[in-house]
Amino acid sequence: MKDVPGFLQQSQSSGPGQAAVWHRLEELYTKKLWHQLTLQVLDFVQDPCFAQGDGLIKLYENFISEFEHRVNPLSLVEIILHVVRQMTDPNVALSFLEKTREKVKSSDEAVILCKTAIGALKLNIGDLQVTKETIEDVEEMLSNLPGVTSVHSRFYDLSSKYYQTIGNHASYYKDALRFLGCVDIKDLPVSEQQERAFTLGLAGLLGDGVFNFGELLMHPVLESLRDTDRQWLIDTLYAFNSGNVERFQTLKTAWGQQPDLAANEAQLLRKIQLLCLMEMTFTRPANHRQLTFEEIARSAKITVNEVELLVMKALSVGLVKGSIDEVDKRVHMTWVQPRVLDLQQIKGMKDRLEFWCTDVKSMEMLVEHQAHDILT
């Protein structure tokens, strides 16, 4: 049995600046007000004053461990995550988290958060195989939770960092966007917003099978790059989203300075040419989606002889559906893969809808005027 009152009294005298906080902890502990005490401890461990040294480890050993069985499991893990940060030996931290996981197994969310923390430590020490297994395990558990919870953001932060480490651009792009969807952007420092926006933008451009940039373009995190020396990335993403090959080539003086993009220039050109074909299909009315080889060649900046190969590639990866008329050198499109639209593309849809409404109105008036002749 630990001398909890003695520890609290000693802490009050050793840190006069925080005496009131220690007194409050002692008061709540003595009165056995466990919920209020949990909230107070949560605030306590997040105070920057206690972030240095091993003060939180001592707090756990001499105080929290005495009543942790009365604490909400998820709150307990939240508290322990702050304690673990003061453990310099990762193996000690991992062992501590494993023991904690057993203590909170009554709560799926607490177990998920604990496993996510274990995965993050494994990633930090370079154990990629265990990190991968942890992510797969936790992902399955998350799918059984109702809605989005407080543990989702921590999981997507871990998974995106793992995919970034192994160079899987497409998976990083997907999970990094999911992370941003689970947090309030205002809670992230501007420097972190800029770094996340930059790595997300690069991953979107370089990721295999990533043809949907609308969600990133509409996310406020991208605005952190505006009017900075990385503004060119926003411009490049907009060029890709609209399939503007000419704009992409004009921006080469900027994106060509980024080593990863410069090394993958041919791949980037193929991707934006496919996006160009998608955009040409999307902007046409549904009843007029016949594209000539010349039109495609002109927009995609390729020769007429290369058009058929481009269309076949788009068909094979499921970006569009349609048929190729080699004799007349035309392509008839029947479907284009849905994407998150930017404001300009939404405006285009609005204009087409207004045109359709006008067309329907004209037909209505025609039928109204000619109804007598038709009926007789």
Curated annotation (Swiss-Prot):
InterPro entries: PCI_dom, PSD13_N, PSMD13, WH_DNA-bd_sf. GO terms for molecular function: structural molecule activity. Pfam families: PCI, PSD13_N. Keywords: Proteasome. The keyword Nucleotidyltransferase does not apply. Disulfide bonds: none annotated. It comes from the Eukaryota. SMART domains: PINT. Residues 171-338 form the PCI domain. The keyword Glycoprotein does not apply. GO terms for biological process: meiosis I; ubiquitin-dependent protein catabolic process. Coiled coil: none annotated. GO terms for cellular component: cytosol; nucleus; proteasome accessory complex; proteasome regulatory particle, lid subcomplex. Belongs to the proteasome subunit S11 family. Component of the 19S proteasome regulatory particle complex. The 26S proteasome consists of a 20S core particle (CP) and two 19S regulatory subunits (RP). The regulatory particle is made of a lid composed of 9 subunits including PSMD13, a base containing 6 ATPases and few additional components. Component of the 26S proteasome, a multiprotein complex involved in the ATP-dependent degradation of ubiquitinated proteins. This complex plays a key role in the maintenance of protein homeostasis by removing misfolded or damaged proteins, which could impair cellular functions, and by removing proteins whose functions are no longer required. Therefore, the proteasome participates in numerous cellular processes, including cell cycle progression, apoptosis, or DNA damage repair. This is 26S proteasome non-ATPase regulatory subunit 13.
